[in-house]
Amino acid sequence: MTFFLNLYKKRRMTDQELGIFGEQMAQKFLLKNGYLIRKVNYRYLKFEIDIIAEKDEKIVVVEVKTRQTAEIGEPWMAVTRKKQRQIIFCANEYIQSRDLPNEVRFDIISIVHNQFRTKLEHIEDAFST
């Protein structure tokens, strides 16, 4: 699912501002589409999950990647196999420590945001255990 929004910013965002913007936009998108946000920026040891949500009695772990341009590739391409393993490890701890059902889906929300437009792409089942 891809959405385009025409937004204009007078100055270029810092990487930190862009990351925060992307995570907030992803949360709004998920809520609008019927997801319950369970946790944001969940940390375990040195690992982090951007968003843990729930929909249709399934835990949905979401990695958000935001870039100002897709010139070197779409943001979702930055979720390497190593990063996937780290997210899975962290998600397993979250689920086991809360005695939640083991049915989990791993999604990526990929956002390109700049002064000309914002493009959001939600990739469901982007990777698996």
List where the protein language model places each region.
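Conserved catalytic cores of phosphodiester-cleaving nucleases, focusing on short active-site segments
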Residues: L30, I49-I72, R81, I87
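Active-site metal-binding core of divalent-cation-utilizing nuclease and nuclease-like domains
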Residues: L36-V61, S128
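Mid-chain, well-packed structural core segment of small domains
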Residues: E71-N102
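Acidic-basic catalytic patches of nuclease active cores, encompassing PD-(D/E)XK
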Residues: M1-V40
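Positively charged, solvent-exposed patches that mediate nucleic-acid binding
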Residues: Y42, E54-K55, W76, N92, ...
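Short acidic/glycine-enriched loop/turn segments that link adjacent beta-strands
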Residues: D15, Y44-F47, F116
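Domain-level recognition of nuclease-like catalytic cores that cleave nucleotide substrates
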Residues: Q96-T129
